[in-house]
A protein has these predicted regions:
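N-terminal secretory signal peptides
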Residues: 1-40
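Aromatic-lined glycan-binding groove of carbohydrate-active enzymes
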Residues: 285-290, 294-331
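Hydrophobic faces of well-ordered beta-strands that scaffold small-molecule active sites
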Residues: 85-87, 134-136, 176-178, 204-206, ...
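Catalytic metal-binding/acid-base residues of hydrolase active sites
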Residues: 90, 239-241, 285, 304, ...
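Active-site gating/metal-coordination segments in enzymes
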Residues: 132, 136-280
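Mid-to-C-terminal alpha-helical segments outside catalytic/metal-binding sites
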Residues: 29-65, 73-85, 92-133, 160-164, ...
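Active-site gating loops and adjacent loop-to-helix segments of metal-dependent hydrolytic enzymes
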Residues: 81-83, 87-116, 146, 242-275, ...
């Protein structure tokens, strides 16, 4: 199960089985079954995703079709030379995995995926897929549960691991989003600036709430202000819910339905992760983040985390109640302040829904490696029946523009 809670949260919830609905016997059964469960975890739910989309476009939408197998083959052959920048590609280290895994089986599973492998295996997968560049980011929840100076030092070590490791060993193949100690906002802002100016990082990636606060909270404004000043984006990756939310939304009193971690998958990659990011996006608009930081840029993965599906309802209802409090129409912020990626959602109909509302100029390619097959993602996109110009924008040109890099 790639989608699980960090060890400390998991342990706390299992110290009180009556409260958290996990008896000792159920725990042991779950752990004994872990290898099978891990295999069917995050990838299973993501590959089975259905109607998600995204939201808001000024220009006419790009139309996707896949009329016949022959036409698909012709399009795919035409675009075999397409270049790719992967904008959501995950890594970890033995130290980080030890912090954020629930047991030894889970740690072994993450090792088997290649999450901590930043050498020949990863480069080989990139070459096989035809992925030119990976933008690396630390596995959720990263260091956001590590308090004080310990978290500050840990974030620095993770960032330096990339600079001194794969970025130095394979020049041009790896870029990175900074890991930030967001629980210490001033230090996080300083580490963002240091990593961008000294090490050439492209921005930062966050993982859900920070001590039960989202990025619209006043405490986190130093990070937003620094990102805007540096002209670098922040990627909103999902995180795990606070315990109170987990209990109300995702837990059950029927312990036989927790033996295979149904509630954890439900609260994570099976559903909760996507709802969590979408909520944070709406909060950032509604509570004036982009009025205070008008040029701040936010990236959202997983084909918009459900936003396209809900787009007209959200815009219709939220526009009315924010017209006096916001400086611009509600939906305009989606045009001006958000970018979206394809990570892990390799489906034509989802991309079509995304492009119905979001300009093709604000969509970027991503795979979500190693939790999905990288080649599956590039093969899928090569066969998407879009004009070559639009496909180049999504595959690499939009990322080149946003991050000021070249493939």
């Amino acid at each position: 199960v790639a989608c699980v809670y960090p060890a400390d949260v998991f342990a706390e919830r299992h110290q009180h089985p009556a409260q958290h609905n996990f008896g000792v016997e159920a725990d042991m059964n779950a752990i004994e079954k872990t290898p099978r469960n891990l295999v069917m975890g995050r990838r299973h739910f993501l590959s089975g995703a259905t109607a998600l989309g995204v939201g808001a476009g000024i220009s006419a939408p790009a139309i996707i079709s896949r009329a016949t197998a022959n036409e698909t083959s012709e399009v795919s052959l035409r675009d075999q030379d397409l270049r790719f920048i992967g904008t959501e590609e995950t890594f970890s280290t033995p130290e980080l995995m030890a912090l954020n895994t629930i047991n030894e089986d889970h740690r072994l599973y993450l090792e088997e995926t290649g999450l901590a492998e930043l050498g020949p295996r990863r480069i080989g997968a990139m070459d096989e897929a035809g992925l030119n560049v990976q933008i690396l980011s630390a596995h959720t929840p990263s260091v956001q549960n590590v308090p004080g100076q310990e978290g500050i030092d840990f974030a620095y070590r993770l960032n330096k691991t990339l600079v001194d490791g794969p970025m130095a060993t394979y020049p041009g193949r790896f870029q990175a989003f900074a890991t930030l100690p967001l629980q210490s906002p001033e230090a996080a802002a300083d580490e963002l600036e240091r990593s961008v100016r000294e090490d050439g990082f492209l921005g930062a990636l966050t993982n859900g709430h920070i001590g039960k606060k989202y990025l619209d909270h006043p405490d986190l404004e130093p990070v937003l202000a620094r990102a805007e000043a540096l002209n670098v984006p922040i990627y909103l990756h999902p995180g795990y819910p606070p315990d109170e939310v987990f209990q109300i939304y995702y837990s059950t009193t029927r312990s036989n339905y927790t033996e295979e971690y149904q509630d954890y998958i439900f609260s994570g990659s099976g559903y909760g992760w996507h709802q969590e990011v979408l909520t944070q996006c709406i909060r950032m608009i509604t509570y004036g983040v982009f009025d205070r930081f008008p040029t701040l840029q936010i990236i959202v993965g997983h084909m918009g985390e459900g936003l396209p599906f809900y787009y007209k309802r959200i815009v219709g209802d939220m526009s009315e109640v924010t017209e006096d409090s916001l400086k611009k129409p509600f939906e305009q912020y989606f045009h001006d302040n958000f970018w979206f990626t394809t990570s892990a959602f390799f489906q034509d109909e989802l991309l079509h829904l995304l492009l119905k509302y979001i300009s093709v100029d604000r969509v970027m390619f991503a795979t979500d490696y190693p939790f999905v097959n990288m080649k599956e993602g590039t093969d899928w996109f090569r066969a998407v029946n879009l004009p070559r110009e639009d496909k180049e924008k999504i595959a690499f040109r939009n990322a080149e523009k946003l991050f000021r890099i070249k493939v």
